[in-house]
Amino acid sequence: MKKFIPVLVMMLFATIALFAGCASKTPTPASNDPVFGNGGLSVIKGDYIYYVNGYESNETTKSSHANKEGQVEVSSIYVAKIQNGELSDKKQLVSKVGGFEYSDLYIFGDKLYFLTPNTRKDDTGEIRSDIITLCSINLDGSKLSEIFTPTQYSSGAFSMKEVDGKVYAFVFDGTTLSQIELDNKNKVTQVSADVTSFATSRDKTCYSENARKSLDSSLDRFLFYSRSRNEQEGKNEGVGGNILEKYDIVTGEKTILSSNINTTTKVTNVEGGRLFYTKGDSYYSMDSSFSNELRHTYVTVDGFTPLGKGEGGEELGIIIKYNSKFYLQKLTDSVIPAVAFSEDNLDIIAVDQDLIIVKDSNSKILSISSKDKSTVTLFEPADEQTLGDKFDFDGRYLVLLESVTDYNSNYSYIVDTFGAAGGQTSATQIGTVVDSDKK
């Protein structure tokens, strides 16, 4: 009997610990549930949406204590169940800054990956919060981990994708391009130094379900970047121009695509199975053969957005912004059409096949079809509301940042655009306001 009592006590404590552990974890989608909208302010997996609660200004994130785990509220990352744009069971997933200048949420497997301002001190004892740190956390809210922090992040760029069943992250810090193998103990490879621009195709999970049907994956295994010449390429002899290079993510092989003397090349997009770049002020592109170069412009333009391919694999063309007007130009043309696609001064915030999501001068958000110019209003801010400059669109849900009356920060809102054709859209606030943020 004396032996039996300690056993009962041990079983009781084990049971309590088990249920306590279960209670602390967040409900999660099934491992095989599909992911939509990777990259940006939000991402959906199954019936759950993961999103930034609000936005922190750059000045706020520079505070030495602004990003301590457990103390972040306004810009932290939340999770909720989502059904037809309605959210329930909202819960803070991680108390770290997720809503800031470089917001980027991705889900691969059962982990959420996100960027957050750096919290570590450098050699001088200063916390360089202007540098990002790539972190991960399990979807149940456990095991927050820091993965990679570059030494700088000036005019940087970040992307994630799955290639041949393995997940990679790519960080361009303004000078150096690095690759992180997340399935290989977060192994970091420096792809190239002296990089001046970088692009890669987006992972299929960044696109809507409809757009995935016509994706061209021929360039998915490559990174493309421009870099300065090295000593062997005439750097010390004053040879002008730079190098356009591709990098095979799987094999590590590098191939020079262009090294024109006195020509400066800048990579801009990888879309629809084509690499887009500029030489001087003109836009060009190449397909996956890398042998046929198309020139798209002869004049300096204000904006250049490739639309990729339609449902049948047809080329949808390019939206060019010129003299504050939109022009829809065929991929094979190099002269801007005589007639404008839109006379309005618009800014593109997202593209989903033939749908172009734009913001007008009054902060109204519209979708325009490149096929027939049909236009639908997706969102119109209320009087005295201020719209942020970050947006996220996954083909259905539009997530944006907007001011809330009597509060200092912008908080997240969601619009279910599937009701737009019937004029039924409205923005629902999903960000949870914080008392300490009151004016």
Predicted regions and their residues:
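Residue position within the beta-strands of beta-propeller blades
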Residues: 50-52, 113-116, 169-171, 207, ...
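C-terminal motif of bacterial Sec signal peptides marking the signal peptidase cleavage site
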Residues: 18-21
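Surface-exposed loop/turn elements that mediate protein-protein interactions on large endomembrane-trafficking
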Residues: 23-31, 62-95, 125-149, 174-197, ...
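Repeated scaffold domains used in trafficking and secretory/extracellular systems
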Residues: 35-43, 99-109, 152-164, 194-217, ...
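Non-cytosolic head/periplasmic domains of membrane-anchored proteins
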Residues: 114-117, 132-139, 143-161, 168-171
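Beta-strand-rich domains and repeat architectures in extracellular enzymes and scaffolds
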Residues: 28-77, 96-104
